[in-house]
Amino acid sequence: MDYKRLLEIEKLYFSHEDVADLLAIKRGSAAVLCARYVKKGLLTRLKRDLYVRTETFAHLGITDLYRIANLLQVPSYISLMTALSHYGVTSQVQRGFVESVSIKRTKAFDRGGIAFRYLKVSTALYGGFVKDQGLFIASPEKAMIDSIYLASMGRYPLDVASIDLSKLDRKKLVRLAANHPPKTRKFLERMYEETGRSREL
């Protein structure tokens, strides 16, 4: 009966306090209840004291998955091939995972069959993102530079052949690459050379 009451919570994700307020019970009792429903598969635990109904999670759109990605590791922003796919810059199909950049350690979380991956960059290279529909996501050019940087360091498998450089602003790419290691700038140059667009740099 209590689980049916949880359907009244309109938030995408909720805490022990939300459950306690709804059911008029103590927070400790709400925590026990949530843990029980996680074991039964009715709730999915996103992180400490944060849950989503499993049935709801299974039908989430990509924007809500991005919001959850922002939440699982703070601070972070959507980037790499996930952002490039979002902007239509790559032909690579994104299924079953969401990629982000963070200043914390490189890590992956599996939630409800979705892999939320975070790759670490230094504080100096963290940025170039915008807030769109309540979520943080890299600009197209920053997502590209993040991908190139990590690939040039041997930390990311970038599918260069899937990238449509014509959809990116070359001046922004060059400007963003300026504070990255020489390897990154060289990688960018090679990408343009291999696609016959080297004069654009």
Q: Predicted regions span which residues?
A:
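Short gly/ser-rich loop at a beta-strand->alpha-helix junction or flexible surface loop bordering the NTP-binding
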Residues: 45-55, 65-125
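Hydrophobic/aromatic-lined pockets within catalytic cores
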Residues: 24, 38, 88, 149-153
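Residues at the C-termini of beta-strands that transition into short coil/loop
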Residues: 10, 120-122, 148
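Hydrophobic alpha-helix position signal
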Residues: 37, 83-84, 160, 177
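A residue-level signal for conserved active-site and pocket-lining positions in enzyme catalytic cores
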Residues: 19, 83, 144
